[in-house]
Amino acid sequence: MEAVMSPMMTCVHKIMCRVDQYGNIDSYDAALNVMRKRNIQITPKESVQFKSFLRMLNMADLCFEVKEEEPCCICFRKDVIYKEVPCGHYICVECYKEPIRNVCPECNAPWPERANDPTVKQYTEEQYAHTLGGYYVTRADGTNYRSQEEYLADLDNIYREVEEADQRDNDPIESDIEEEMNESEAEEEEPVPEIAQFEALNTPPPPPTNRRPKIRRPMERARNTTRYDSEELTNMLMTEVATRVSLRGGVGDLNWITQIKNDIRKIQAASYRSRNDNMMIKYFAYLVAIIMPNECEAQRREILKLHAFRCHKRNARDCCGTCGMDMCNQRTYSIREIPNNNGSRLITVCGRCNQINNVNNTAFRLLYNYM
């Protein structure tokens, strides 16, 4: 076959390169006539092979559509859509779609073979396998593709396993939530703390035990109920702060400071509802003067700056700690720390007394100015 085609390639190349010498060749028969004039003898079978040889590869991704005035170099037709092959020659679309060789008929430049690309074949067989109803398509390498029904069955199994896993994960969470709700309902049904304390005086103490008692914070009950007023909530917070300090061995934990800020916000909300601002001052004095030591001055100032008696702006009922003036209509006031035998205490000072104290340099230490 190669021996037959090799002289034909030379002849065809010469014919295509010298078309102008033989006039306008606009058909395949005209090309055969030109070959007969050049004493090129071919059989009918070789004629079919020669016609197929004049077709090129399907290389649409390597070419682009153009329109040239010259005829196709294979069929010699004009007024058709042409393609430019990688070597720079032009052929028509019809001749371009039926190739048998991977070379250019003009210059014999080799092209990469696209028909042997396994990607297109694999994609076609896989799509064909999915459209069937339970049949398999086997490739030459022995790889089998599953049908669409089996893929859907696998998806159903995966969905069922995910649902069962979620149910297993949610069971302990639901049980914990139900247990907490039962505990909250039981705590709401407990008697008032004052009555419980009075009954505890008449009840003999329990026998000693080696088991460490569980520390129950008062704030746990305060979060689950709303029957406590501002004063009672303040006392409970004081007890909780003292418990935290005793357990942690002092102040210095940022998480502890953050929790105190959250407690102060709760006291502010309770003070607004009950219109009892003295509870705020009582809690601040207890927190700053007794609980927080001197080495926590920066943290103490931070808390005072964030929460320094905002309730006075709305409905104040306090008086100045020096002159006794009612602080209800005062727009500006200050918080000062006064040293005493037990350490120090906080007082609220009106704007006039604050200015006098600043001039006289009294022992009052300014902590915060509220404008």
Curated annotation (Swiss-Prot):
Keyword Transmembrane annotated: no
Zinc finger (RING-type): 72-108
Signal peptide: none
Entries under InterPro entries matching the protein: Znf_RING (IPR001841), Znf_RING/FYVE/PHD (IPR013083), Znf_RING_CS (IPR017907)
GO molecular function: zinc ion binding
Disulfide-bonded cysteines: none
Region (Disordered): 178-218
Name this protein carries in UniProt: Putative RING finger protein ORF117
Organism of this sequence: Ostreid herpesvirus 1 (isolate France) (OsHV-1)
